Regions:
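A conserved beta-strand element that flanks and buttresses the S-adenosyl-L-methionine
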Residues: 82
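Class I SAM-dependent methyltransferase SAM/SAH-binding core
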Residues: 22-70
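Short alpha-helix
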Residues: 151-181
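A C-terminal cap/extension of S-adenosyl-L-methionine-dependent methyltransferases
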Residues: 176-261
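Conserved alpha-helix/loop element of class I SAM-dependent methyltransferases that forms part
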Residues: 1-21, 31-35
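A short glycine-rich, Lys/Arg-flanked "PGG" loop and its adjoining helix->strand segment in the class I
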Residues: 94-110
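Short conserved loop adjoining the S-adenosyl-L-methionine
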Residues: 70-75, 91
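Conserved class I S-adenosyl-L-methionine
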Residues: 106-141, 154
Length: 261
């Protein structure tokens, strides 16, 4: 079972995701269709910036030509918004994530590359790419890169703290719960492309120690999912009950001197 499918099933079993609820997939493709079908999702719109689409590629699901960095979606139209390994193709992955958060009615689920000390070392050694050449080459050198163009995109890698700081900046009035899932994805396909057999063998041999470190320290894994539960948001204790402003009663409790007094 893939990490994607396993995470979906976990959240469905816990009642955090509803397979029957309207669901938007951002920067989606065939893998999303296959995985969501297997997980039992029924009301899905898969969106991307692929001008080659005619509209029925993801049937029985709908398709829409949508820019993930500027979602033309009424907030709440989709109960849940899902993205799998597509934000790093955006010009601004942060903007795309915040667009998903703005528009989702209940929750956002994202799967992306994770930054870590181990990943930075692997990048320096050339085990993992800084730019994604394979995706463009695999699409006839015309698509698959930055904003689905022929320009290879940088592989943006996230941290938990980065996600939390973004949400705190965008929605400061609320405490927003975020849950994380971790996975190790070994670069077998990339290693297979190495022309020199000795270098290829050396790369394969290096996977064992990296795998051991990642298993012992899960936050050194190179892929993670994060689930943003908008329904479980809590108003900050220093906000007015209606969420409109800072509470005067909180600020004037004696711990702080009210500058407006």
């Amino acid at each position: 079972m893939s990490f994607y499918l396993e995470t979906l099933k976990t959240l469905i079993a816990e009642g955090k995701l509803d397979p029957a609820a309207p669901t938007l997939v951002v920067a989606g493709g065939g893998k999303d269709r296959a995985t969501l079908m297997e997980a039992g999702f029924t009301d899905v719109t898969i969106s991307n910036l692929d001008e080659r689409m005619v509209g029925d590629e993801f049937a029985p699901y709908a398709w829409s030509f949508i820019d993930g960095e500027n979602l033309p979606v009424e907030p709440g139209r989709f109960a849940q918004i899902i993205e799998h390994m597509g934000l790093h193709h955006c010009g601004s992955p942060h903007r795309a994530l915040l667009e998903m958060y703005r528009c989702a009615g209940r929750s956002v689920l994202v799967f992306e590359n994770r930054d870590s000390l181990a990943m930075r070392l692997a990048t320096r050694l050339g085990f993992v790419p800084v730019y994604e050449f394979e995706a463009v080459a695999g699409n006839g050198y015309r698509y698959g890169g930055y904003r689905n163009t022929a320009i290879p995109n940088a592989v943006y890698r996230w941290t938990e703290r980065e996600v939390e700081k973004m949400l705190a900046s965008w929605d400061p009035a609320h405490q927003v719960p975020v849950r994380y899932f971790y996975n190790l994805r070994l670069p077998h396909a990339r290693i297979a492309l190495i022309g020199n057999p000795l270098v290829r063998a050396a790369f394969r041999a290096s996977l064992l120690p990296f795998s051991l470190v990642a298993r012992i320290f899960p936050k050194q894994m190179n892929e993670f999912g994060f689930f943003i539960d908008k329904q479980a948001r809590a108003l900050q204790p220093w906000m007015e009950p209606d969420g409109s402003a800072l509470s005067r009663s909180y600020w004037g409790t004696g711990k702080w001197k009210d500058p407006a007094a």
